[in-house]
A protein has these predicted regions:
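N-terminal leader/targeting and accessory segments in enzymes
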Residues: 1-96
Length: 96
């Protein structure tokens, strides 16, 4: 039996990260699971765009949104400008 993904509200994520919603038309209230791996994103997930030595998660935002991620947690707003007006997507910017 597969374990259900934890659910988090947008408000819980904002409190935990100190982030702010920067998307213009988001109606998302909850996320069903969190992923840092774009290959494993499922519909309803919050994708955390980590920047590492070899990869920058910001480069995979389009891919995870095509997989129906409900939101993305980002640092670099410039890399997600094309998605700021996307409906039903919460884009949350954090300092670090």
């Amino acid at each position: 039996m597969k374990k259900a993904a934890p659910k988090f509200s947008v408000e819980e994520v904002l409190r935990a990260t100190g982030g702010e919603v920067i998307s213009k038309s988001s109606t998302v209230k909850r996320f069903c699971g969190i992923s840092t791996d774009s290959r494993a994103v499922a519909p309803g997930n919050l994708f955390v765009a980590l920047k590492g030595e070899n990869f920058d998660g910001h480069d995979f935002v389009r891919e995870v949104l095509e997989k129906e991620a409900a939101g993305v947690l980002i640092q670099d707003e410039e890399k997600v400008v094309p998605f700021l007006t996307r409906e039903n997507t919460a884009i949350i910017r954090v300092a670090d």
